[in-house]
Amino acid sequence: MRLHRIELKNLNSLYGEQSVDLDGQLGDAPVFLILGPTGSGKSTLMDAIALALFGQTPRLSNARNEPDADARNVMSRGTGEAFARLEFSKKEEGARCRYRATWSCHRARKRADGDPQDPTRTLERLDSATGEWETLVSDKRAKFFQPELDRVLEGLTVKDFQRSMLLAQGEFAAFLKATETERAAILERLTNTSEYREIGARAAKRRS
C-alpha cells in the first residue's frame, strides 16, 4: 500500500480543513520527519490515517468499552463535524489501483452542543479511464462497509497498523513483543514477502 494524500477536518488540535499531499510535497523522499511541539497535531495525522482505514485510532477505540474511548472524541472541541480521508493505492492483478477511504462524523444538526451521530464510512475507487471517483460503499452500518474495506485492505487490521506503522505512546515495544507468527503475518502483508517464500520453496525443491 502506498499513501498519497491525507485530508482532515476538525480533528483534535487541527481545526478546519487540512491536507498533506505526500506526493507533491514530499516527492520521492524515502524518509521524512514530522516535527512540531507537543499538541501541534503530529499524532493527529496518524489518527486520520487510522480513522479513514479502520474507523478507530490507537488512542481511542470502542473495543475498550469506555465512554471516553469512543473514536468520535477526536472531533475538535467546539465544532459540529469532522472527517478523515486517506487517498492510497495498491497493486491489483499487476496494475496499481487508487482508492479513497473516508471516516466522517457530525453532531446533531451539526451544532457543537449536539449529540454525536454514528460515523459514516466511505470507500471510493478512481476510474483510470475517466479520472472520476466511483463510490464502492458509503454507509453507517458495518455489515455494508466492512466487507468492502476488508477486501481492499487484504486482511490488514488496526492491530497490524499499530504494531508496524504507528506505535502510540506506551506501545513502542508492541511489534517486538508480538509472537513470531504475528510478526511474520504483519511483515508478509506489508512487504509482500509471499513472493520470497515461494522462491525459497522452489530453491529448496531444486536442491533436494
Give the residues covered by each predicted segment.
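Extreme N-terminal "head/tail" segments of very large remodeling/mechanoenzyme assemblies
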Residues: 1-153, 160-162
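Extended, Lys/Glu-rich alpha-helical coiled-coil stalks
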Residues: 33, 37, 130-135, 140-146, ...
